[in-house]
């Protein structure tokens, strides 16, 4: 009776929330969890395979690629594709999407929510994308966070799918007897190098890791004299092109994708790894990968007549560097709109922008840079310190700032942080209404 009441109240809450113009992703789960504290555990027990996707960057793209590919092959799933990746949002997804025929759940999970959610749900597999500095006022230092995750997931029989090229992710191998590695061959692609490194110290002994090849930041082929090393990958990208969309060679199979950004190659590979471990073959994966387009502000493309735009979320130095690199891959003039909010969900500490490589903008052909959000003036200062000699316009209203980019001929590169994403994406959809997206 308690479970029935929880589910029905949650569904009513969803309808009410949407009726007043909200998404209704967290509220149903919050209400259900108060009525029945075991609701998530009960619903999860009805599913055969539960896949958790976590990491600092790339969770949403990886999760959506997996979800889209399964649906493209007529496989029913539970999927929190609206991005609500904490306990309440995950509970909402199970309540709204569970059916007797649904036997797979694809769940994006916030790194900080892993200890709480794993008290209620044990996934059959977890894939980790990467670990970078991100809102450390929420989680503490990366080493502490990774150690906490390892302790939480240990001895639970979870199959771990790990990015072999990230030593932070690879160290999670201590938490399971069943490990599958994915990675990228040396020289598969020439990533832009950054001066930002998370840590290149061995998690076993503390010595400086030796790198045979670096893709970017701490991502690459590494080893230590104590024996810790980059493991051999079962699933591997041998080469790829990006112009600006990805053309991947994974395990000698080609994938012509509709997502941009070289950093998304790792996200596609993480998704591929999950799908292969779920039993899909190359052709079924190709059916999904080659029909996937972003509609959630992650490398999302817009076009109307001669005006083009692309938006990509950036909430830490690595994400910002990746977004700024997109502009370098685009020919001709650009206009940037960059937003920085410091709301609770963003993390109050915005000092990470000083670790991002804004200096690279000085090499691009830029008509103007519009800075917006609650910390617009701090962005303006950061750009001045980077000696970016283009007009820098401050417009704190995100809607107005985004709309203003339509006054310029150049390609709009829109870079919001977390709570800036919804208003910036909404305005781009308005501005490009009737066009291509």
Swiss-Prot record:
Reaction(s) this enzyme catalyzes, per UniProt: beta-D-GlcNAc-(1->4)-Mur2Ac(oyl-L-Ala-gamma-D-Glu-L-Lys-D-Ala-D-Ala)-di-trans,octa-cis-undecaprenyl diphosphate + L-glutamine + ATP + H2O = beta-D-GlcNAc-(1->4)-Mur2Ac(oyl-L-Ala-D-isoglutaminyl-L-Lys-D-Ala-D-Ala)-di-trans,octa-cis-undecaprenyl diphosphate + L-glutamate + ADP + phosphate + H(+); beta-D-GlcNAc-(1->4)-Mur2Ac(oyl-L-Ala-gamma-D-Glu-L-Lys-D-Ala-D-Ala)-di-trans,octa-cis-undecaprenyl diphosphate + ATP = beta-D-GlcNAc-(1->4)-Mur2Ac(oyl-L-Ala-gamma-D-O-P-Glu-L-Lys-D-Ala-D-Ala)-di-trans,octa-cis-undecaprenyl diphosphate + ADP; beta-D-GlcNAc-(1->4)-Mur2Ac(oyl-L-Ala-gamma-D-O-P-Glu-L-Lys-D-Ala-D-Ala)-di-trans,octa-cis-undecaprenyl diphosphate + NH4(+) = beta-D-GlcNAc-(1->4)-Mur2Ac(oyl-L-Ala-D-isoglutaminyl-L-Lys-D-Ala-D-Ala)-di-trans,octa-cis-undecaprenyl diphosphate + phosphate + H(+)
RNA-binding is among the record's keywords: no
Pathway(s) this gene product operates in, as recorded in its UniProt entry: Cell wall biogenesis; peptidoglycan biosynthesis
Active site per the UniProt annotation: 349
Disruption phenotype: The gatD-murT double mutant shows abnormal peptidoglycan composition, with decreased amidation of the glutamate residue. The mutant has a normal morphology but growth rate is greatly reduced. Mutant shows reduced antibiotic resistance and increased sensitivity to lysozyme.
Any one GO molecular-function label of the UniProt entry: zinc ion binding
Listed EC numbers: 6.3.5.13
Database matches in Pfam families: Mur_ligase_M, MurT_C
The protein's assembly and partners: Forms a heterodimer with GatD.
Family as reported in the entry's similarity comment: Belongs to the MurCDEF family. MurT subfamily.
Stated role: The lipid II isoglutaminyl synthase complex catalyzes the formation of alpha-D-isoglutamine in the cell wall lipid II stem peptide. The MurT subunit catalyzes the ATP-dependent amidation of D-glutamate residue of lipid II, converting it to an isoglutamine residue.
Name of the protein: Lipid II isoglutaminyl synthase (glutamine-hydrolyzing) subunit MurT
Gene name of the encoded protein: murT
């Amino acid at each position: 009776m308690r479970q029935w009441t929880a589910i029905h109240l949650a569904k009513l809450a969803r309808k009410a929330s949407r009726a007043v113009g909200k998404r209704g992703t967290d509220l149903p789960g919050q209400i259900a969890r108060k009525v029945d504290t075991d609701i998530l555990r009960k619903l999860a027990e009805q599913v055969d395979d539960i896949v958790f996707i976590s990491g600092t960057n790339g969770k949403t793209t990886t999760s959506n690629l997996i979800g889209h590919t399964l649906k493209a092959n007529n496989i029913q799933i539970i999927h929190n594709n609206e991005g609500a990746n904490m306990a309440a949002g995950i509970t909402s997804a199970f309540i709204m999407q569970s059916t007797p025929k649904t036997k797979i759940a694809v769940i994006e999970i916030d790194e900080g929510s892993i200890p709480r959610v794993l008290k209620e749900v044990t996934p059959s597999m977890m894939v980790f994308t990467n670990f970078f500095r991100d809102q450390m006022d929420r989680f503490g230092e990366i080493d502490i966070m990774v150690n906490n995750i390892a302790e939480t997931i240990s001895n639970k029989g979870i199959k771990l799918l790990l990015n072999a090229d990230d030593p932070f992710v690879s160290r999670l191998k201590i938490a399971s007897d069943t490990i599958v590695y994915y990675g990228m061959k040396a020289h598969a692609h020439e990533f832009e190098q950054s001066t930002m490194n998370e840590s290149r110290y061995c998690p076993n002994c503390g010595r400086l890791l030796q790198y045979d090849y670096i893709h970017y930041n701490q991502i690459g082929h590494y080893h230590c004299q104590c024996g810790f090393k980059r493991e051999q990958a079962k699933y591997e990208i041998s080469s790829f092109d990006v112009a600006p969309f990805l053309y991947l060679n994974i395990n000698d199979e080609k994938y012509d994708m509709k997502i941009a950004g070289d950093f998304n190659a790792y996200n596609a590979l993480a998704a591929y790894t999950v799908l292969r471990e779920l039993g899909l073959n190359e052709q079924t994966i190709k059916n999904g990968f080659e029909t996937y387009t972003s509609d959630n502000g992650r490398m999302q493309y817009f076009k109307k007549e001669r005006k083009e735009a692309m938006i990509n979320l950036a909430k830490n130095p690595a994400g910002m560097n990746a977004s700024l690199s997109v502009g370098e891959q685009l020919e001709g003039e650009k206009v940037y709109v960059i937003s920085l909010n410091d709301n609770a969900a963003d993390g109050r500490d915005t000092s990470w922008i000083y670790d991002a490589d804004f200096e690279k903008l000085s090499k691009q052909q830029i008509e103007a840079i519009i800075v917006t959000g609650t910390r617009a003036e701090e962005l303006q200062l950061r750009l001045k310190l980077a000696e970016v000699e283009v007009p820098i316009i401050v417009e704190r209203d995100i809607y107005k700032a985004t709309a203003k980019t339509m006054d310029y001929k150049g390609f709009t590169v829109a870079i919001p942080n977390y709570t800036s994403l919804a208003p910036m994406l909404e305005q781009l959809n308005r501005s490009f209404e009737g066009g291509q997206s």
